[in-house]
Amino acid sequence: RVLRENRGPDGGLYVPFREPVFSREEIDALKEKSFHQCVAEVLNRLFNTKLTRWDVEFCVGRYPVRLVNLPQRIIAGECWHNPEWTFDHLVHILAEQLRGGCPGADGGWAKTAVGIAVLFGIFGEFARAGITEHEKRVDISVVCGNFDLPMSAWYARAWGLPIGNIICCCNENGNLWNLIHHGQFRTDTVSVPTGTPEADVTLGANLNGTVIARNIDVQAESHRT
C-alpha cells in the first residue's frame, strides 16, 4: 500500500512500523559494495523485495549519482544524472521497479525510502575514498524548499549511518528561519524570486513529516533521560 499511495485512508503519513538498525559491521561493509548494491540491499530491507544490483543499474544507469569536490572540504552530491535531470526521476524509476511496473505513488514514504537508500550508496562511495568512517561523521546540507532528503537523512542517521548535522539552508525569504527561531510560520507571505528557486517556496515539501519525526525523537530522548 505504501508504494501505491502517499497517505493512509485517514490522511496520515506512512512511517515504518519497525525501524531497522544497521550494525557497525554492516556500515563498514558498504565500502566493499557498489552504489547499486547498497541501494538494492537497503530497499530490500525496507520493502522485503529481492532487488539485485543489476536491477538498480538497469533502472537508473551506471552513474546516477556523482560526487564533486568543492573548496572548504565540501562535496556536492549530484543526484540528477538521468534523462529527466531530476532527483524525482530517480525516485520514480526505483519506486516503479519496487511496484513491479504497476502504477502508484512516488511521494510520501516511497520517496523517503529511496532517499535513504541513495544516502547509503553515497556513504559507500565516501568510505571507499576514505572520506568517512564511524568516528568521522559527515554533515549534510540541503536547501530548505524540499525536506524529502533531510527526512531521509534523519532516518538514515537513526539507523546507523555516520551523519552529523543536517543543515537546511535558507535564503532571504527566511520563512523557515522564522519557524525555527521564533516559532512562527506564515503561509500568506509572498516569496521574492532569488538565485536559489527551490528555497523560494512558502511551504517546503515534507516539512510536516520532518517536524513530526523531530518531535518523536525529542520525546523518546526525554523518556530515556
Regions found by a protein language model. Name each.
Residues R1-T225:
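PLP-dependent amino-acid enzyme catalytic core
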